[in-house]
Amino acid sequence: MDSEQYKNVIIPSHLHEIEEQYKVKILLAVESGSRAWGFESKDSDWDLRFVYVQEPEWYFHIEEQKDTIEHMFPDEVDLAGWELGKALRLFKRSNPSFFEWIHSPIVYYADEGFLSDIKTLEGRYFHKEKAMYHYNHIYKKHNDRYIEEFGLPLKRFLYYLRGILVCKWLTDFGTVPPVRFTELVDATVSDKTIKDKIAHLLKLKKQSNEHNQEPVDKELFDWAQGQAEYYNGVVESLRPEIKAEKDDELNALYYRFVHKNIE
């Protein structure tokens, strides 16, 4: 089954099934992970992430209610969603994963106004220091687990490399990093030889299966290790001061989209 059939038929159908089964209204549904980054393999899963509002009754319980949905379909479509209030609380805390959601280049559905409204607020709530900690943790995790010799899954090396390059973007520009890996490489890698080696790995990844092992070029490997060590030092020197923001605008957005969808 080709990707266009997934995007245009299967995924919209699954989103409708989620709304019916869980009695919710989806505000935003996007692709996350390797397909959004642009280094999916031939057999990569579909990782959908979504934001939703519940039926009116959900909002009138004195007990805390479950505010997440996770559902795996048998055709390798994996969905995970957050209720709008949870999503906004994480947005307020500068959650890097949520910022990736709202900047995903693959949007399956967006409620009119929601995506633009949330993006107008991101300058107040995005904190590069928190993002640096997050992506530094990602590449250190993949380094500790997988990078002991040059032969390793391409997927893991690209995860590792992406974490490093996001830290470089954050250091150089201090803004929300691009989701597409090629955009990140173009903006942060000036050495043409290294850039060409990354492009070659990316091509191999797209042509291979998810867990294929391929040798990583030693020059690229050494370059990445050097960058990783440098940004480890940058992160260790950070002294983040995240000031508390008032919730008025987020509360208003929450009220507006809940009210709009439960009338």
Over which residues does each language-model region extend?
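Acidic, carboxylate-rich catalytic segments that either coordinate divalent cations
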Residues: 239-263
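Conserved NTP-donor binding/palm subdomain of two-metal-ion nucleotidyltransferases/polymerases, i.e.
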Residues: 14, 24, 89, 119, ...
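Conserved nucleotidyltransferase catalytic core and NTase-mimicking acidic/glycine-rich helix/loop elements
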Residues: 116-246
